[in-house]
Amino acid sequence: MRLIIRPLTPDRWTALEDLFGKNGASNGCWCMYWRIGSAYHKRPRAKNRTAFRAVVKRGPPPGLLAFDGHVAVGWCQLTPRHALPWLDRARLLKRVDDAPVWALSCFYVRRGYRKRGVTSALIAAALSVAKRAGASALEDYPVDTDQPNSTSNLFTGTASTFARAGFKTVARRAPHRPIMRHDLRAPEDVPDRHGARGPTRRVPVE
C-alpha cells in the first residue's frame, strides 16, 4: 500500500462522502462536533453534511485525505485551533496558552485499513502542512488508553500513537485525556507513516 495524502478541496468532496458513507462517519457528525458541539446530533445528519460541505467550499481545506490509489481510506481534520470553537468549551481541552497552534482534532479510517499505518501517515503529513502554514505547534487531544476508565471512542486518536510521532504532553486535566503538542519551530524531524523519525522522511502531500 502506497498512501498519497491530499487536502480536502471541493473537487474531492465525493471521495470524502465515499469514505464517510451514508452515516457521515461518527454518528452522523460530518466533522461538525468541534464546530457546534453536541448540537450536531440534535439535528438531521443531512444538515451536518450540508454544513461541512459549505466549510469545504469556502476553504481553506479543513483537513487531509489519505488515498490508496483512487480510494480515500483515511481522513483527519486539520485546522488552526481557532477554527474549532468548541474546543474551548470542553473543560479538559481549553487553551494551554495563546500560542498560534493548529489542531489535529479527529480521524476516520476506512474499515479494512485500520491498524495499517493510515493514522500515522496522516499525522506525518499534517506536521508538514501545519509547519508550512506557519503554525508554531501542532496540537492534538487524544485518549490515553493506558489509563483506567479511558473511553473507547477513539476518533481523536490515541496518546501512544502521537507519542511515537514526537508529540509531548503539555496539559493533562484528566488522567485519560492529555493535550499533546509537536513543536514546529524546532529543526524539522517529521516521522514517517510507521512512526520512524528522521529529517529526510516524508509522506507525500499532493
Where is each model-derived feature located?
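Conserved GNAT acetyl-CoA-binding A-motif
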Residues: I123, A130-S152
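C-terminal "cap" of GNAT-fold acetyltransferases
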Residues: N153-A165, V170-E206
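Conserved N-terminal entry element of GNAT/NAT acetyltransferase domains
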Residues: M1-R35, D192-R193, R197, E206
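Conserved acyl-donor/pantetheine-binding loop and adjacent beta-alpha core of acyl/acetyltransferases
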Residues: R58, F67, V71-R110, R114, ...
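Short, well-ordered beta-strand micro-motif
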Residues: L65-F67, Q77, I179-D183
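Conserved acetyl-CoA-binding loop-helix of GNAT-fold acetyltransferases
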Residues: C106-V109, K115-R132
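Active-site rim helix/loop that mediates acceptor-substrate recognition in acyltransferases
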Residues: W30-G63
